[in-house]
Curated annotation (Swiss-Prot):
It comes from the Eukaryota. Residues 595-611, 640-668, 783-809 have a biased composition (Low complexity). Residues 765-782 have a biased composition (Basic and acidic residues). It comes from Dictyostelium discoideum (Social amoeba). Residues 135-154, 174-183, 612-639 have a biased composition (Polar residues). One of its GO terms (cellular component) is nuclear pore. This is Putative uncharacterized protein DDB_G0279765. Residues 123-183, 249-274, 592-668, 765-815 are annotated as: Disordered.
């Protein structure tokens, strides 16, 4: 039987769902499965079973559960819950032994009655006289029983016990299976789950106070069934389902539901969602689905084991406030068994006691019992109209995924976001599936949902929902600058870091008037001990996209570049103004100085980026490792009114060069400065030659074209131009004072931020490629070794099987 034919649905179960049984005759075949009657409910023991490792088939496949039903006897539960997960567990009801024997006898009687009816039907069809019904011998699969008819009464006597079976057959008989549910299986138990802080709940029970609610109605971590797309957030994130306690407004809710039925479907759905959105009672559901086509109101929520135990599968989201992480949480499970005609008939009480109980005054009896485990307590209350039990399950709330975000690093208009991920779980690995960035308008970030209050008639806004999304691709370009790509797997106590680049696009669109943007960093991850994946949303403040009405430039070049090899820097120029521009790019001819760090330090930092870890310096982390397109940041321009033309600009550059050369005597003179460590006798031709070499290498980056005429650029259009550079030394260098001159309006535009170029030697580049090739080869070799081992094991197994078969054949021949 497939998993889609079995059901256990707790969501929305109510007393009215079982009203169809009130008019059903007692002798009908729909009453062949009693469920859990009142006597068994009071005397049974309850146990909460949370599997240590999640198995999807054990939660959804009926046949797989039946084959592994022995796991319900030796229950090894985990003592922790993960923040944001969909916790799937089982509540096992273990009736007493007397009840189990009574149920077996009832099943035997039902089997006999069914076989007698089948025999009578077969005899009537063949028109033959019925044989004397002195004894009925059942098949080997059914129990061996003899039915004798004396004095109009039926007595059931067992035959003599057969000889004890061998040990193998005894083990097969001891194995537990899942019984197939009958068509009358019904949910005669209702569950209410409350999550409380353990210390607060224990204090509230002693002082008769209500414990504080720790549910987070706008959770930071939530469970999602499907992966998120880039243009929306899953509805399960913005519509978290919670039940409210409807003890005071039951009649009002029924009237509201009747009124909603006359309205449109959209209004009906929204009202239904709001009516059960807030409260201390968490809505629970179960993965099984089974419904009788003839009875649409049927909602069974359990399955029975062959030993007589009942199993109720339940799933509940763990959405708890972040302040309660790493603390002991108490899950309070209140079990209600509402009475109806069917339950009264199933009870062992006589009619007189039921009538007296129905007309008696309200009275309750409280009782409490403790199980063998310290973390599980059972209590109960018996009322005249329903019976309740309470189960307490303690667990520790953990969050194994620790995330650290740093976004205070900017290069031009580009925001560099450093993301550090850490797996704090001691034993399980974490698989990080995706990491994305979503932008929100501040004014639409939080929207309130109006719901009905519990204690008063008026409605109050209590829930905050996530606001509307801004399409990221229209305003920003997001890229991952790290070497490794997702998904990745983090082992216990391991860390992983990456750098995300967020930069505005060259062609901007009109934005809605807002104060700014909120950024959500979305991280989806999976852990083997939990079901599905967890979606974590972290808030991050981003800068507003720079808006200009003149020019915007973005650069594209290879990084790192190879020593003594020419490379191109591509300038993409967008004319955002309403007028025509005739542009020329000017590169300053002065000596381009090296950045603050020395070349040896740069080489050490570059080598540290090969392991996938990013350092605190965003320049090294973004430029090391591999060739990245659109590496340069989008650079905005300052408009400068100038009365001089292009020639004056070159004169200014020469003056600046003169100032820099005056500050450094080595650049303007060939005389060596006298220092305390240098003696005049040491001056020789060799020292002068070494000085000339240093002087020549001070030009670290050489531009082969000082000026490039771009030409006319129409309004709202873009154009690109490439300029060649030649690196002469290893390090990280800056290209400063790049200007654009508009000959029509005679305006000079200068770039705010310099371009940064990283240059490495060919040997260093070859080492990186060799290391990457070695890693790939090692992984391939491991896979090949594993495959070879599997092939060898399979061959050995086949050889062993063949040898065993040959031995068996030889033994038979000898016999």
């Amino acid at each position: 039987m497939s998993s889609s034919t079995i059901s256990a649905m707790l969501m929305g179960a109510a007393d009215g769902d079982l009203n169809y049984l009130n008019s059903t005759p007692i002798g009908s075949s729909l009453l062949d499965d009693m469920g859990l009657d009142e006597d068994d409910f009071q005397s049974s023991s309850f146990e909460v079973f949370i599997p240590e490792s999640y198995d999807s088939k054990f939660m959804s496949d009926y046949e797989y559960i039946s084959k592994n039903a022995n796991r319900f006897m030796k229950c090894k539960s985990r003592e922790y819950a993960i923040q944001g997960e969909l916790l799937k567990f089982f509540i096992i009801v273990r009736p007493p032994d007397d009840s189990k024997k009574r149920q077996k006898q009832q099943q035997i009687q039902q089997l006999l009655q069914q076989k007698q009816k089948q025999i009578l039907i077969n005899q009537s069809n063949t028109s033959t006289p019925p044989p004397p019904q002195k004894s009925i011998i059942t098949n080997s699969d059914s129990p061996r029983l003899i039915v004798s008819d004396t004095t109009s009464t039926t007595k059931i006597e067992e035959q003599q016990p057969p000889p004890p079976p061998p040990q193998e057959e005894q083990q097969e008989q001891d194995s537990i299976t899942v019984l197939q549910p009958s068509t009358s299986s019904s949910s005669n138990l209702l569950f209410e789950l409350q999550l409380r802080l353990a210390s607060d709940y224990e204090k509230s029970t002693k002082e008769n106070q209500n414990p504080l609610n720790i549910i987070d109605y706008n959770p930071k971590h939530s469970f999602v069934n499907t992966e998120m797309k880039n243009d929306h957030i899953s509805s399960s994130k913005s519509a978290t389902s919670y039940l409210r306690q409807n003890t005071l407004n039951v009649n009002n809710n029924k009237n509201n539901k009747n009124q909603n039925n006359n309205n449109n479907n959209n209004i009906e759905n929204s009202n239904n969602t709001n009516s059960r959105f807030i409260g201390d009672v968490v809505e629970v559901s179960s993965p099984f689905t089974f419904k009788d086509t003839s009875n649409p109101y049927q909602k069974p929520n359990f399955f029975r084991l062959s030993n007589g135990d009942l199993v109720f599968p339940i799933e509940v989201p763990i959405y708890i406030r972040e302040i309660n992480e790493d603390k002991l949480i108490t899950m309070v499970i209140k079990i209600n068994r509402p009475k109806n005609n069917r339950n009264n008939i199933a009870s062992s009480d006589n009619k007189l006691e039921r009538l007296i109980q129905g007309g008696a005054v309200d009275k309750s009896v409280n009782y409490t019992m403790r199980t063998s485990t310290a973390s599980l307590g059972v209590g109960g209350t018996i009322h005249n109209n329903k019976v309740t039990r309470t189960i307490l399950k303690n667990f520790t709330l953990i969050q194994p995924m620790k995330v650290l975000l740093q976004s205070n690093t900017t290069i031009g208009c580009k925001n560099l976001i450093c993301v550090s991920l850490e797996n704090t779980h001691p034993t399980s690995n974490i698989t990080i599936k995706s990491l994305d960035i979503y932008l929100f308008h501040v004014l639409n970030m939080e929207s309130t949902t109006i719901i009905d209050s519990v204690s008063s008639v008026s409605s109050i806004p209590t829930h905050r929902q996530i606001g509307n999304l801004v399409k990221v691709n229209e305003h920003y370009v997001i890229s991952n600058l790290s070497n490794h790509r997702l998904p990745i797997e983090l082992e216990p106590s391991n860390q992983y870091s990456m750098v995300l680049s967020v930069e505005p696009s060259s062609i901007q669109k009109t934005l809605q008037p807002t104060e700014g943007f909120h950024t959500k960093v979305e991280l989806s991850w999976h852990i083997p001990c939990s079901s599905g994946q967890v979606l974590s949303l972290y808030e991050l403040r981003a800068q507003n996209p720079p808006f200009t009405t003149n020019l915007m430039i973005s650069t594209d070049y290879k990084s790192p570049v190879i020593l003594n090899e020419k490379f191109l820097v591509k300038f993409n120029i967008s004319n955002l103004s309403n007028s025509l521009k005739n542009l020329t790019i000017n590169i300053p001819p002065s000596i381009i100085k090296q950045n603050g760090s020395s070349s040896s330090n740069n080489n050490s930092k570059l080598s540290s980026t090969n392991s996938g870890q990013t350092s605190d310096n965003p320049i090294n982390s973004s430029n090391g490792g591999q060739s990245i397109k659109k590496q340069g940041s989008n650079l905005s321009l300052n408009r400068q009114q100038s009365s001089t033309k292009l020639n004056n600009q070159s004169n200014n550059n020469n003056n600046n060069n003169a100032n820099t050369t005056n500050q450094n005597n080595l650049n303007s003179s060939r005389y060596i400065p006298v220092e305390t460590t240098i003696q005049f006798s040491e001056l020789s031709n060799k020292s002068l030659l070494s000085y000339e070499e240093i002087q020549r290498n001070s030009v670290n980056l050489l531009c082969l074209e000082k000026s490039v005429h771009i030409g006319p650029v129409n309004s709202k259009n873009s154009i690109s131009a490439s300029i060649e550079f030649l690196p002469l030394s290893v390090g990280i260098f800056e290209i400063q004072n790049i200007t654009l001159y508009d000959s029509i309006e005679q305006i000079t535009y200068s770039l705010k931020e310099p371009l940064q170029i990283c240059c490495v030697s060919r040997e260093h580049n070859n080492e990186e490629h060799n290391n990457n090739n070695k890693e790939n080869n090692n992984e391939n070799n491991k896979e090949n070794i594993n495959n070879n081992n599997n092939i060898i094991n399979n061959n050995n197994d086949n050889n062993c099987n063949e040898n065993n078969n040959n031995c068996n054949e030889n033994n038979e021949e000898i016999k």
